[in-house]
């Protein structure tokens, strides 16, 4: 259990170093762009899926 605590402590220190530096701002900007990109893709595929359902295929 102590090893897990040490691993998470190291991860927290690395995250703090990134957070207090300027990397967090750049990462947040990239995350916003990716969020809207995948949101648009989701809406497009949702519409395509709803329009593509025309009933069961003929047998």
From Swiss-Prot:
Its lineage reads:
Bacteria, Pseudomonadati, Pseudomonadota, Gammaproteobacteria, Legionellales
**Keywords attached to this entry:** Cell membrane, Membrane, Transmembrane, Transmembrane helix
Name this protein carries in UniProt:
UPF0391 membrane protein lpg2521
Choose one Gene Ontology CC annotation of this protein and give it. Answer: plasma membrane
Q: Which family does it belong to?
A: Belongs to the UPF0391 family.
Against Pfam families, the record matches this protein to: DUF1328
HAMAP family the UniProt entry points to: UPF0391
Residues crossing the lipid bilayer are 5-25, 30-50
Organism of this sequence = Legionella pneumophila subsp. pneumophila (strain Philadelphia 1 / ATCC 33152 / DSM 7513)
In terms of one coarse class, where is the protein primarily found? membrane
Q: What membrane topology is given?
A: Multi-pass membrane protein
Keyword Disulfide bond listed? The answer is: no
């Amino acid at each position: 259990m102590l090893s897990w605590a040490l691993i998470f402590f190291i991860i927290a220190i690395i995250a703090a170093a990134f957070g207090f530096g300027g990397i967090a701002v750049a990462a947040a900007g990239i995350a916003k762009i990716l969020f809207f990109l995948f949101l648009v893709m989701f809406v497009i595929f949702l519409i395509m899926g709803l329009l593509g359902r025309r009933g069961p295929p003929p047998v």
